[in-house]
Every structure is written in structure tokens, then in C-alpha cells.
Amino acid sequence: NNGKRPVVQLDAHSDEVGFMVQAICPNGTLRIIQLGGWVNHNIPAHKVWVRNRFGEYIPGITASKPPHFMTEQERKAPLDMKDITVDVGAVSKEEAMEKFGIRIGEPVVPDVTFTYSETTDLMVGKSFDCRLGCAAILKTMHNLAGQELNVDIVGACAAQEEVGVR
């Protein structure tokens, strides 16, 4: 880059969907808010990781009221985020904060293990759009290094695409 030519920016987003601890309930479960685009009824019954104040990741399970405890009206109603919690095994707010080290504002991420099947030549994982976009920028920048171009190339791995670029 010499600063005298038009600039072409290669851009990909590096963030991914997740949650944030909004409150710690008296029974030790966590209320969460969404970071990015989620469909509420897809959230319960999944393993997640909650980062604590020590930087450790605590396993948890997203939960909602079981259908056998719901009224017929509740079963027909859309699931609201206020009715979704994360259970990390704490039995009180104090235990969640002191023993588990969880604070309001801590990130919560889905536990999705990357796998590759040689039989089908398929990968299973999360955030491929983010990771592949950033990898494509790096590979392109590497391939273009040292080439004479009539433009300057800039690579950017941006954030906040998942939350509406606020």
C-alpha cells in the first residue's frame, strides 16, 4: 500500500451470536439476554459455557419451564426470553457469585464442538460465516503480498454484525 491509489477493503465479521448474564436469580439460575439473532424456542435444552470473573468457563444448560408444568395457554404462547434461564448447578445467588464466580455481564456461548467427517467430507460447527470470512481475507492478503496492483488492499475483521452494527 502506498496511499496514492484507490483502496479496496476486504471485510468479514469476526463476532458470533451468544448471550450475556443479565441477572442472577435467588435460586442460582442465570437470566440471560441475547447477543445476535436467536429464535427463542431454539434456545432451551442446549449446553453453554458461562465465563466467570476468573476467565474460566463454567458449563451450563439453557432451560425453560417444562411442558408438563405449563398451562395449555403457556404451551401455545411464544417463548419469551424472560422465561429462559441457564442452570450451572448453583443453588443460590450467593453460590453462583461466590463459588462459581459468575457476575452480571459475563458472556455465555453455545457449546458446539467442531467435527469433521471423512466419510461425508462435511464439517459441523458454529460461526463458519465468521471464521471462513476472516480466513478468506487472510489467505487473500497472503496471496496478494508482493504483487503489483493498481489499488491498495486493506483487510478488516469487523465486529458487531451479529448485534445490528450498533
Regions found by a protein language model. Give the residues of each.
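N-terminal hydrophobic/helix-forming segments and targeting peptides
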Residues: 1-166
